[in-house]
Amino acid sequence: MKAIDSQDLEKHTPMMRQYLTLKAENPDVLLFYRMGDFYELFYDDAKKASELLGISLTARGKSGGDPIPMAGLPYHAVEGYLAKLVQLRVSVAICEQVGDPATSKGPVERKVVRLVTPGTLTDEALLQERQDNLLAAVYHGKKGFGYATLDISSGRFVIAELESCEALEAELQRTSPAELLYSEDFSEMSLISAFEGTRRRPEWEFDFDTSQKLLLDQFGTKDLQGFGLDGARLSLQAAGCLMQYVKDTQRTALPHINSIVRFNQGDSIILDAATRRNLELTMNLQGGHSNTLATVLDNTTTPMGSRMLQRWIHEPLRDRQRIEARQSALEEILENGLYDELHPLLKSLGDVERITARLALRNARPRDFSRLKHALAILPEIQQILARCQSAHLQSLARIISEFPEELALLDSAIVDNPPMLIRDGGVLKPGYNAELDQWRDLSQGATDYLAELEAREKEATGISTLKVGYNRVHGYYIEVSRRESDLVPLSYQRRQTLKNTERYIVAELKEHEEKVLSSQGKALALEKQLWDQLFDLILPQLHELQLFAQGAAELDVLANFAERADTLNYQRPVLTDIPGIQIESGRHPVIEQVSQTPFIANPVTLSPARKMLIVTGPNMGGKSTYMRQVALITLMAHIGCYVPAQSATIGPVDRIFTRIGAADDLASGRSTFMVEMTETANILHNATPKSLVLMDEIGRGTSTYDGLSLAWSAAEYLAQKIEAMTLFATHYFELTQLPELISNVANVHLDAIEHGDTIVFMHAVQDGAASKSYGLQVAALAGVPNPVILAAKHKLHHLESRDNHNTQQTDSSGVQQSMVFPDPIKSPLEEAMESIRPDELSPKQALDILYRLKDLS
C-alpha cells in the first residue's frame, strides 16, 4: 500500500483515517486492527493475510471512492494465526481499542500495544518449548564482526567479538537466530542471505555512544566494566541495536534483561559451521531434529533443562575444572540414585524461566501464576535432597535454588487452584483474598440467584412452561417464551426481540436487577484486574532471585539427566588430562548404537604425540565415517561434563574440532561439490593446531584421480608434519597407506570385511594396518547396480590389474610407485587397432578391409 498524505486521508471515513495513520506508523508488518470481537486487516495486508492464513478476502464498502479489501479473524483465535505467521517469519502489529466506546466521539481510540516478531516472542503458544528463540544482531567493522543475541523469553543477553567470516558463520550456525538484524551498509550479505528472518536496520541504531547509553540505562549502571566487556566495541554496537529493537517492539519495561555476558570463543572448543552440521549435534543433515546427539542425550524433565543441554552441546568447555565439577556432581547423583528422586520433582517445576520473563513483561497469564505457585511449593523437597549431597557443585546449586516462602504464601492465598486462561473473565483470585472483591462478588451472585427465583415465579404466575430468563451482551437480560405460548404473555411484558421460534421480553423488575447485576459484575471485574496488576508489583522485587532459581533448576535437570543417560546407556566417566592425545577403549557412536537394528561394534582409537594421524581405509559402508564421527562425539561429550559411550576414555587438551565429511553442491553460492570440499579443507589447514581434532573423509574425490590423490597426499602430509594435529584421515587412495613408512607419527588402521563368494560381510571392526582392497564392486552390487554392469566392471578390473602387474614399477621421490599414482591411460579398441596397423606392409585389398573394420569400431 502506497504512503497516504494528509490530503488523501481527508477522502476517507474517520475510522479508515485512523487505520491508515496507524498503518503508516507500522509499514513493514501486518496490522491487526481490533474491531469488537475481530481483528481486521485492510488493503495489501488483507490480501497477504488471506494468502498466508487461508482466510476469506472480502470488501468493506468504499472509502476514498475505492472498495476496501478486507480480511478478519476472531480475537479469541488470534494465537493460532499468530503462530502460523511467526513460523513464516512474518511480523504483526497488534492494535487494540484503548478508549471507552460509551464516551468516544468518533472512532474509539486505538493504539498498537505490541509488535509480534519471530525473535521477540514470549507467548507460550508461539514458542517451541525445548528450543531457544533468539533475536540477533550483527555489525561489521574494520576489525571483524560484532554479534549479539538476546532471548527475550528468558533475559539471556550474550555478545561476541568475531574476527573472521568463518567465525561469524560458526556463530550463526551455533545460535540459529529466529530473527537477525543487520546494518544498512552490511557488506557480507552472502553470510546471512540464507536466513529468512533478516531485518535491515538504520545505521544510527548501531552507533556506539547511542548503544552504550541504551545499555547503561537498561542495566542501571554507570559503566559496563563490571560485565567484562573491555574491547567489545563492535559487539556492543550490535547489542545496542538489539535493545532499541526490543524497546520498539515490546513497548514496556524489560526488568528481566539485567545483565550481559561476553562469549569468548577461547573458553570453549571451537566448532566451525561445517563441523556442527556434519556431527549432527542438534539438527540432522536433512534439517530435522531426529537422530541427533541431542535427541539421544536429552531425557530432561523441564523445557528449560532441555534448552540448557542444547547450549552445552554447542559450547563444549575447555576449562578442566568446570568440566570436572559437572562430572563430580553427575557421579554423586548417579551413585546415590538421586535422579529417580529428582526427576518427578523437577518435572513439576515446568518452565519457570519463561514464566519469570512473562512476569517481568507483565504479560503473564493466570495459569503462569498457578504454575509458579506449584513450582515454589516443590522447592523444599528438592532442598532436602540437595542437603544430603557432598559435591561442591551441587551445594552451590542448592544455594541458588532457594526457597520463596513469602511469595509462595502470597500466591497460595491469591490464585485459585485451576484459574481460567485470561484475567478479563474474572474468577482468578481466591475468595478471601480481598474483602471488597468478595463483597462485589456476593452482590453479583445474589443478583444472579434472584434471576432464578424470578424465572420460577413468572412460570408459576403465567403458566407458560417454556418461559426462561436469559442474557446476551447486545440485549442484556430478557424473558424468553416460545412462539406457540406467546399469546399467554401478560400485558406488562414489553417485547424486546423476535426470533424464528421465540419471543423475548423485558419487565421493569428485570431491568432494575439487570442494572444491579451488571454494576456489581463490572465493579468486581475492575477491582480484580486492579488487584491482579498489584500482584505483579508484589512478586517482581524477587525477579532476579527467581531467574537464578530457574537457571539452577535447569542445570540440576541437565545433570540428573546425564546421570540417567549414563546408567541407562552404559556410559563411563572420561578422564581429562594435560597429556596430549586421545585414548578410547571400546568406543561407540552414541546415536548409531541407539537406532541400529544390530548390535553396535565398539572400536578403540589411540592418538598421541607419537601417533598423531591415522590413515583409515576400508570398504564403503564399512564404517569409516561412523568411526571418525564417534571419536569426535565422544570427545565433545567429555567436554560438556557428560559420561561417554566407551569402556574408558582419556582425553588430553582439545582446542578445536574440524570435520571434512561429505559434500554437496552449494547452488545458492554457486559453489561446486569440489569447491565446497576445498574451502573446508583450506579452513582446516589454516586454523588447525597441534591440539585440534581433525576428521578428513575422502579428500580429493571431487576431481580427477591424479589431482585428487595429489591434494589428499599433500593435505595429509601437511597435517601430520607441519601442524601435527590429531587427525583421522579416511581415504580410498591406497597410495596414502605408504605415508607411515615416510612419516613417523602416522599409522594405518582399517575396517574389516569378509567375502563370501560374490557377497561381502562388513565386520565394522577397526584393525591395525591398511585394508587389502576396497570392495567397490561388491558394494555396488549391494546397492542394486544391474548385474551386466557388475560383470563388465569385473572384466575391466581384471584387465586393469593384469596390466598393472606387467608394468614396470617406477618409484618417485616420495616413495610412491609411479604406476599406482599415475597409471597408463586406458586405450579404446579403436586406438589399439590403429596401433597394430603397419601401413607399409599392407596390400590395397588389406588396407580397404582394415578401413571397414575401423569404421565398425568407431
From Swiss-Prot:
Under the heading InterPro entries, the entry gives: DNA_mismatch_repair_MutS (IPR005748), DNA_mismatch_repair_MutS-lik_N (IPR007695), DNA_mismatch_repair_MutS/MSH (IPR017261), DNA_mismatch_repair_MutS_C (IPR000432), DNA_mismatch_repair_MutS_clamp (IPR007861), DNA_mismatch_repair_MutS_core (IPR007696), DNA_mismatch_repair_MutS_N (IPR016151), DNA_mismatch_repair_MutS_sf (IPR036187)
Could you list this entry's UniProt keywords, alphabetically sorted.
ATP-binding, DNA damage, DNA repair, DNA-binding, Nucleotide-binding
Q: Specify whether DNA-binding is a keyword of the entry.
A: yes
Q: Which Pfam families match?
A: MutS_I, MutS_II, MutS_III, MutS_IV, MutS_V
Task: Name one molecular function that GO assigns to this entry.
Answer: ATP binding
HAMAP family named in the record? MutS (MF_00096)
Any idea what job this protein has?
A: This protein is involved in the repair of mismatches in DNA. It is possible that it carries out the mismatch recognition step. This protein has a weak ATPase activity.
Q: Which family does the UniProt entry place this protein in?
A: Belongs to the DNA mismatch repair MutS family.
Q: What is this protein called?
A: DNA mismatch repair protein MutS
Species of origin: Shewanella woodyi (strain ATCC 51908 / MS32)
Q: Which gene encodes it?
A: mutS
